[in-house]
Amino acid sequence: MTDIKYKRVLMKLSGEALAGDKGQGIDLETVSAIAEELKDVHDLGTQIAIVVGGGNLWRGEPASKIGMERSRADYTGMLGTTMNALVLQDSLERAGVQTRVQTAITMQQIAEPYIRGRAIRHLEKGRIVIFAAGTGSPYFSTDTTAALRANEINADAILMGKNGVDGIYDSDPNKNANAVKFTELTHLDILQKGLKVMDSTASSLSMDNNMPLVVFNLNTPGNLKRVVLGEAIGTTVTGEK
């Protein structure tokens, strides 16, 4: 029997990951490829929950900076995450994986409301659960949503797949050829060094609850499965030493 390191995970999937090379919008081929990666991990027996972002469709904070009321801008972004969630759900179900979408804002015609106990029950029954609409409140990022939901469902770790970046660096490796990669960090390191991984609210919540985080390159086929099996790829972030 395959030795699985993480038996229940919270996958943080950025909206940009669904855009592929386009950089914005939704690329259905890219979404289908991600769904196949998730299916491979699901087939191992790992329980998977997903928090999906919406940056490929909308960003609330920049909109607020040019005059849009911040709460309204953030709520618009929550609708974007729901669009992404429904597209991902469709790809997963076409791949043969039963999937449920739960939203933090009630949209009963298209998804279940977020109910912790029901989400855990879905996971126990072998369904993938996608959490959409953030926390349901403005001013909170989907990174913070990921940290919150991971703790609520008692996940073993948060898995954060990046586009073309294979871990956490001391500076942007796409802009600095001499950027240094970290293989291990603590959440306190991230806060003290000001590393751009998660926002400080998400990092603090993860640190306070000793929630591990693994950051890896989602674009490399099989990487998600390797992380779940415990291979040392990307960067692993743990509680304070």
UniProtKB/Swiss-Prot annotation:
A Gene Ontology cellular-component term: cytoplasm
Positions with a binding annotation for ATP: K12, L13, S14, G15, G55, R59, N163, Y169, D172
Main location: cytoplasm
Enzyme class: transferase
Alphabetized UniProt keyword annotations: Allosteric enzyme, ATP-binding, Cytoplasm, Kinase, Nucleotide-binding, Pyrimidine biosynthesis, Transferase
Documented EC number(s): 2.7.4.22
Record bears the keyword Transferase: yes
Annotated stretches, region: Involved in allosteric activation by GTP: 20-25
Compartment list: Cytoplasm
Catalyses which reaction(s): UMP + ATP = UDP + ADP
Regulation: Allosterically activated by GTP. Inhibited by UTP.
Protein residues bound to UMP: G54, D74, T135, G136, S137, P138, Y139, F140, S141, T142
Keyword field contains Transferase: yes
One GO biological process term: UDP biosynthetic process
Gene3D superfamilies: Acetylglutamate kinase-like
A molecular function GO annotation: ATP binding
Pathway: Pyrimidine metabolism; CTP biosynthesis via de novo pathway; UDP from UMP (UMPK route): step 1/1
Function, as annotated: Catalyzes the reversible phosphorylation of UMP to UDP.
Subunit structure: Homohexamer.
Family, as annotated: Belongs to the UMP kinase family.
Protein's UniProt name: Uridylate kinase
Gene name linked to the record: pyrH
